[in-house]
Amino acid sequence: MTTNGFDPFEWRSFYFPGMSREEAHKLLGEPQVSIGTFLMRDSSRPGEYSLTVREADEGNAVCHYLIERGEPKEDGTAAAGVKIANQSFPDIPALLNHFKMRVLTEASLLAAYKKPIIEVVVGTFKFTGERETDLPFEQGERLEILSKTNQDWWEARNALGTTGLVPANYVQIQMEFHNDRTSKGASQSSIGSSGGGAERFSSASTSSDNIELQPRLPAKAKVTFDRVPNAYDPTQLRVKKGQTVLVTQKMSNGMYKAELDGQIGSVPHTYLRFTAVSE
């Protein structure tokens, strides 16, 4: 499992609605789960949350903390903020960030236990998003599907770890995952990770996906989609479909560093397909 931090503002990516205290305890109590790994779930008290944390290796210790709504205002209007024990915070990200740097009982919050992956999909169209809960993506961008809230909208996670809803008819399934989340840590992402994921998967596409068979770098790769990055970001490489680039490095954010006509920059791995040795 990775312990490279988390984004407090993306707390819904490690929030498990409907999960019981017992299931959360079992998940984080597994021997392979690292100290400081945590998740959020619904409390038995309606409208409030619980923070479940792996605190120690001895006895696979797991602790549960109630996240309460803040005290109602003096005028009787809705409660403001949240609190844990006797400490109050303006919102959940502030609470998580506080305990990222401070100890709860025996450990700080080090790594989020992320939702397991159901499927990996690729965007067939660009989606800009209309609501705060939507997850915008580009054509060709790769996403992890975490849950299918209904037939039309799925919960997804991108290479940066941002989660949100995506329209099902804007993506194409690339891989199906078969997870047993009670026996393995699901914080390992298949997107943006250079290590091997714990999940088992089977291809759901009849076409070959050479990007999964990464050769030793540096290596040549074909560009599969046109890409015009933000003009104000000089670290990104502009490429056109059909061009051949030299990939020199795979970065921790899931992008590749590549060279083209003397220019060096970053390209999302979903825009590249490694060429066979004979090509």
From Swiss-Prot:
Q: How does it assemble?
A: Interacts with ced-5 (via C-terminus which contains a candidate SH3-binding, proline-rich region). Forms a ternary complex with ced-5 and ced-12. Interacts (via SH2 domain) with src-1 (when activated and phosphorylated at 'Tyr-416').
Q: Which organism is it from?
A: Caenorhabditis elegans
Output one GO BP term: positive regulation of engulfment of apoptotic cell
Renumbered residue ranges of the record's region Disordered: 181-213
Indicate, by first and last residue, each region the UniProt record lists as having compositional bias (Polar residues).
Answer: 202-211
Which PROSITE patterns did the record assign?
A: SH2 (PS50001), SH3 (PS50002)
* MF terms (GO), sorted A to Z: protein-containing complex binding; receptor tyrosine kinase binding; signaling adaptor activity
All copies of domain SH3, residue ranges: 116-176, 214-277
- What family does the database annotate? Belongs to the CRK family.
One Gene Ontology cellular component term attached to this UniProt record is:
plasma membrane
Q: Which Pfam families match?
A: SH2, SH3_1, SH3_2
Per its record, how is this protein called by name? Answer: Cell death abnormality protein 2
Lineage: superkingdom: Eukaryota
Keyword list (alphabetical) reads: Phagocytosis, Repeat, SH2 domain, SH3 domain
